[in-house]
Amino acid sequence: MQTTQEIQTSQNPLERRIDMSLAVADIDKAVEARLKQMARSVKMPGFRPGKVPLKIVEQTYGPQARSEAIGAAVERAFGEKVREQNLRVAGYPRIEPKEAGSEGALEFSAVFEVYPEVVVGDLSAQSIEQPTLVVGDAEVDKTIDVLRKQRTTFEAAARPTQDGDRVTIDFAGRKDGELFEGGQATDFPFVIGAGSMLKDFETAVVGLGVGETKTFDMTFPEDYHAKHLAGQPVQFEVTLKSVEAPKLPEVDSDFAKALGVADGNVDKLREEVKGNLEREVKRRIQAKVKEQAMDALLAVTPIEVPKALVESEATQLAENAKRDLAARGMNTKDIPVQPAWFGDQAMRRVKLGLIMAEVVKGNELHAKPEQIRGLVEEMAQSYEDPSELVRWYYAQPDRLAQAEAVVIEDNVVAWVLSKAQTSEKSIAFDDLMGNAA
């Protein structure tokens, strides 16, 4: 067996090629050895197990034995060359047989990618903004209001409809004077302003009294999901059957009990809400800072990435998306989730993975046991029995590995912050929580 030095190809700076030459005589010996081994256990009609003549075994299994022998020899030759040259192979090699080889030899080329050299750039000019927010009574009040709205009940109202009411209607829609598919319903309930109906439709219903009928024109949005209606002018006739006004629960003992405060103490409820908010605010601020830190690393560390790793990551992201859809009860066979959809995300994740690995290795940022324990205990604080979650994490190594990965990311973020320019900026509660109007 002979191999030549790996060669960089011109198309891809990370692609390499190793040429290999395998002696036919060596392959023949390997084939014969495989056939003899197979003959010991192969079963054929008319022969006892292990008594089939080698010639007959060769006639039946010869091509399979030769293919396996060549595959094993190529794999062995490739592995030896990779170790000899200290190459870090990314993905699997593509084996290409050569049409014209030397006499008495089989010649192949192994084409593969290697991991890039990662040199993290200077972060001193990178700016990272750290949001700040102190959770106070106003934030607690807003959150309790959200919790109240989630428990809204409705009572019959003897007045015209207004925003927030739950109404029941009959309606019929016409396009060019003809009823269109999906445009009719009876005893149809919806909450005005909840967004379940088109805004123009909801607006037209406001001000109606029970028993009143209204006819109005509207135009479907250009991006409406029903293509035959997108951008089309239509006319609706609506009859109001009932109107119910929203009623929010009082913040009292019953409300507190409904939210898990056993003794119904409202002050205790506010304390729990504040504690949960502080944890959520911390988590969201950390996420914003982490994203900036990752962007900074990418900005100062331009690298080529192996296509094989990006393709593998995109495939994994697509599979994750399918599992998520299936968990929501959707039939993924009807939804053609393609790895290509995740190309940019996969590229970013692979780049960051390579860069972070270099940062961790070069700066000894591996997770310490006490850091992992601290993170797990912090996450457990939002549970009724924190010790149960801690035990759950420590019961399986793979669960603890997830916590370890988070700690390592936090260590990298802290390292970036120590190198970059940082500043603090107050952020509004609604902006941080995504509730801004």
Swiss-Prot record:
GO terms for cellular component: cytoplasm. Disulfide bonds: none annotated. It is found in: Cytoplasm. Keywords: Cell cycle, Cell division, Chaperone, Cytoplasm, Isomerase, Rotamase. Residues 164-249 form the PPIase FKBP-type domain. It is an enzyme of class 5 (isomerase). It comes from the Bacteria. The keyword Cell division applies. The keyword Hydrolase does not apply. It catalyses: [protein]-peptidylproline (omega=180) = [protein]-peptidylproline (omega=0). One of its GO terms (molecular function) is peptidyl-prolyl cis-trans isomerase activity. Its EC number is 5.2.1.8. GO terms for biological process: 'de novo' cotranslational protein folding; cell division; chaperone-mediated protein folding; protein transport; protein unfolding. Involved in protein export. Acts as a chaperone by maintaining the newly synthesized protein in an open conformation. Functions as a peptidyl-prolyl cis-trans isomerase. Consists of 3 domains; the N-terminus binds the ribosome, the middle domain has PPIase activity, while the C-terminus has intrinsic chaperone activity on its own. Belongs to the FKBP-type PPIase family. Tig subfamily. This is Trigger factor.
